[in-house]
Amino acid sequence: MATMACASSLTFPSAQTQKSFFGTNVKQTPVLSFPRPTVAAAVAVSARKSTSASTKCTEEWRQLKEAVKKEFAIPHVPLDQRWMFTLEEATGPDIWNTTWYPKSADHVPTDKKWYVVDATDLILGRMASTIAIHIRGKNLASYTPSVDMGAFVIVVNADKVAVSGKKRTQKLYRRHSGRPGGLKEETFDQLQKRIPERIIEHAVRGMLPKGRLGRYLFNHLKVYKGAEHPHQAQQPIDLPLRDKRIRVEK
């Protein structure tokens, strides 16, 4: 346990001291401690000669106590209750040594970017992966898996999306009504003629998280059959396509 000294350097009570810094008796309760440089600067002006050593010690301690009260004052906390607070609670969190994680409040939906992509002659899987990356927000340096950080993506000309190989006739889409014998199966060509938007939605949904966040992110995808879309007010920009093999070679 540290002790008080009346010399040129001062030592302060440790966390196990039963008498608090502000004069209130506390049983086995940590007290408010302060950094040495700040306290030394506060009592530097009190280094003057005195006729009595005991008087000098008392005067230095009084000035030190007043300086600490002024510097680390907590207006909303009574003086006799400040022993319950640590230095971090008095001066604020240590932001330099604490990892910061973005919260959902840091990303307002009205501030998100809007992208538009023309699906004409684009490979379905490669286009869907690019869309999922931007909806998820993985293209951002501050990406956090648990936060909605992505953008909105608009897909036009969904009926002109392309696939490679023999997927037009071999790729199957299945759905079930939930009743006995309710399994329905159709090929890529059949579904593209019936509901072309569902093909892109199915591909992107499978690349998003499975859960509440994934269901919320899926609402950021807007797919349209033709070349027009009703989101001109959002001023969408072209989706960056960096995959050189994303377009079908003719």
Curated annotation (Swiss-Prot):
Residue range of the transit peptide in the UniProt record, numbered on this chain: 1-47
Location(s), subcellular: Plastid, Chloroplast
Single GO MF annotation: structural constituent of ribosome
Signal sequence annotation: none
Annotated Gene Ontology cellular component terms: chloroplast; cytosolic large ribosomal subunit; ribosome
Cited InterPro entries: Ribosomal_uL13 (IPR005822), Ribosomal_uL13_bac-type (IPR005823), Ribosomal_uL13_CS (IPR023563), Ribosomal_uL13_sf (IPR036899)
Main location: plastid
Domain of life: Eukaryota
SUPFAM superfamilies tied to this protein: Ribosomal protein L13
Example GO BP: translation
Keywords: Chloroplast, Plastid, Ribonucleoprotein, Ribosomal protein, Transit peptide
Oligomer and partners: Component of the chloroplast large ribosomal subunit (LSU). Mature 70S chloroplast ribosomes of higher plants consist of a small (30S) and a large (50S) subunit. The 30S small subunit contains 1 molecule of ribosomal RNA (16S rRNA) and 24 different proteins. The 50S large subunit contains 3 rRNA molecules (23S, 5S and 4.5S rRNA) and 33 different proteins.
The family this protein is said to belong to: Belongs to the universal ribosomal protein uL13 family.
Cited PANTHER family: LARGE RIBOSOMAL SUBUNIT PROTEIN UL13M (PTHR11545:SF2), RIBOSOMAL PROTEIN L13 (PTHR11545)
Function: Component of the chloroplast ribosome (chloro-ribosome), a dedicated translation machinery responsible for the synthesis of chloroplast genome-encoded proteins, including proteins of the transcription and translation machinery and components of the photosynthetic apparatus.
Descriptive protein name: Large ribosomal subunit protein uL13c
